[in-house]
Amino acid sequence: SIHPATLTQADFLRGRLGYAVYDMAGAPDAIRRDMQNLPGTVVLISSPAQGAASAPDRTYARALGQIAREVFGPLNAGALILTGGETAYSVLDALGLRVIDLEDEPLEGVAAGWAEGILVMTKSGGFGGEEALHALAVYAAKRLGIHRDST
């Protein structure tokens, strides 16, 4: 999502240990370059803050869908945290994930479930405080049996 709340949440993760934050423009190449260092890392692909008001969510959502299709398989990711309806739809569609078996609400207003063995969480782009994405990443790690520092 390009909503200011989501951009604030992405900024909260920048520079924190265990997180790799990529801007959309160079994400596929940068992720491929860093792939050997990414296992156990939360990878966030963020929309650029500048220009966010001039390009529709749909444009960024489609681009994220294409990026997910390019890099998701090689990363063998265990979870997806998707922000914004257009983003969620585009990424899930690009990955061929059609059904999510919902089972939890890790934060108020955030749906979580499983799609073909992948933990999927979706939230509105404008929802949550600055620590929301971090809290969801910690939740995902616990569900996947990965020990992560919760701070």
Enumerate the language-model features and the residues they cover.
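Active-site catalytic microenvironments in core metabolic enzymes, especially phosphate/sugar-handling
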Residues: 1-151
